[in-house]
Amino acid sequence: MVKPIIAPSILASDFANLGCECHKVINAGADWLHIDVMDGHFVPNITLGQPIVTSLRRSVPRPGDASNTEKKPTAFFDCHMMVENPEKWVDDFAKCGADQFTFHYEATQDPLHLVKLIKSKGIKAACAIKPGTSVDVLFELAPHLDMALVMTVEPGFGGQKFMEDMMPKVETLRAKFPHLNIQVDGGLGKETIPKAAKAGANVIVAGTSVFTAADPHDVISFMKEEVSKELRSRDLLD
């Protein structure tokens, strides 16, 4: 069984007020924070690194953190690693507060070894594929994953147009692995979320559509309901 998970991408936030921006979307109903890490090599853009994640973790504790005596908003940190040689970053990001390390299939020579390395650090392991990568590459790996990510834009920049022709990949994964968390990332908003939900995605990354919304709660609630409706129709809703 799976559940709807909304993971706003902090790439679309106001970095001058990052902690407050994250509290805003968590209080509006976000489940995870999607943290895009780009190295300027695997993708042309550069975003943020471990010091920012460490700092943000102090502002946004893990759910269930007993030391959170101030009752700060909490969230699961979903780190999307758009980097070359992702193996070299696993230990650092596990230490700085990542809850999940999502690597790109295209960036590693031995994805299964990388999954085992990630899990050995006590965090969840996920694998992403670019639009040009066949979904077939995930079939042997999926039983070992906590999540699969199907990119619905070319990775590297926010605010791109949703690629509807990626939905057959999601449909295939949901049919083969009904209880796997399947994430979509890129161009997701009120107009496109029904297509992603119908295909079988349950983890939704949304950036500008949430962070710049007049009412983030309304957007997040709509997304959750669309995903819940489709999961319910498949008898998969947790």
From Swiss-Prot:
Q: How is the cofactor bound?
A: Binds 1 divalent metal cation per subunit. Active with Co(2+), Fe(2+), Mn(2+) and Zn(2+).
Q: In which pathway does it act?
A: Carbohydrate degradation; pentose phosphate pathway; D-xylulose 5-phosphate from D-ribulose 5-phosphate (non-oxidative stage): step 1/1
Reaction catalysed by this enzyme: D-ribulose 5-phosphate = D-xylulose 5-phosphate
The record's EC number reads 5.1.3.1
Q: What class of enzyme is it?
A: isomerase
The Swiss-Prot or TrEMBL record lists the needed cofactor(s) as: Co(2+); Fe(2+); Mn(2+); Zn(2+)
The protein's name: Ribulose-phosphate 3-epimerase
Report the source organism. Saccharomyces cerevisiae (strain ATCC 204508 / S288c) (Baker's yeast)
Which taxonomic lineage is given here? Eukaryota, Fungi, Dikarya, Ascomycota, Saccharomycotina
